[in-house]
Amino acid sequence: MAGSLNKVILIGNVGRDPEIRTTGEGKKIINLSLATTETWKDRITSERKERTEWHRVVIFSEGLVSVVERYVTKGSKLYIEGSLQTRKWNDNSGQEKYTTEVVLQNFNSQLILLDSKNSNNHTQDSGRSEYKHPEAKNHSFDHSDLDDEIPF
C-alpha cells in the first residue's frame, strides 16, 4: 500500500454544551460529545430498534473553535470531518487509561452546522452553515498557461 488514510466523517447531535478550555499558551480547545443513532427494524418482532453511539470530539483548529464557541449548543446537529486519535495517560492511581477521540486540528478538518436554529446569519440557501479550515482552498489549474505544442 502506497499510503494510508485516517479520516472520520460523522453526522450527529451534540450531547451537551461544548466545553471550552484554554491552554497555558492561551490557545482554546473545545471538547464535545456527538451522538450518532442507528435505527433498524427487527426481523423477528418487526419492532423499530435503535442504538446510539457517543463520540468524543476535540477541536484544536482556531477557526473551528470560534464557530463552535458562537453557534454550537446542546442538541445542535453537526457534520464533522476529522481524524481518529487514541490518547494514553496514567490516572491518579498510576493505572494506564486510554481514550479514542475524533480530532479536528488541521487543514483537512471540517465542521458544518446542519440545523438552521443555530446558524443565525451564517445560513446559506440550503439552511446550512459551513466552515472549512482556511488552508483548505480549492486551487484551480489554469489551462490557458499551457502551450499548444506537445513536447514529444
From Swiss-Prot:
Signal peptide coordinates: none
GO MF assignments: single-stranded DNA binding
HAMAP family in the record: SSB
Compositionally biased intervals (Polar residues): 115-124
Keywords, sorted A to Z: DNA damage, DNA recombination, DNA repair, DNA replication, DNA-binding
Keyword Oxidoreductase: no
Biased composition (Basic and acidic residues): 125-144
Motif Important for interaction with partner proteins, chain ranges: 147-152
GO cellular component: nucleoid
Source superkingdom: Bacteria
Domain SSB: 5-111
InterPro entries: NA-bd_OB-fold (IPR012340), Primosome_PriB/ssb (IPR000424), ssDNA-bd (IPR011344)
Gene3D superfamilies documented for this protein: Nucleic acid-binding proteins
Protein name in the entry: Single-stranded DNA-binding protein
UniProt lineage: Bacteria, Pseudomonadati, Pseudomonadota, Alphaproteobacteria, Rickettsiales
Function: Plays an important role in DNA replication, recombination and repair. Binds to ssDNA and to an array of partner proteins to recruit them to their sites of action during DNA metabolism.
DNA-binding region residue numbers: 54-60
Gene that encodes the chain: ssb
Subunit composition and interactions: Homotetramer.
Renumbered residue ranges of the record's region Disordered: 115-152
GO biological process: DNA recombination; DNA repair; DNA replication
Pfam families: SSB
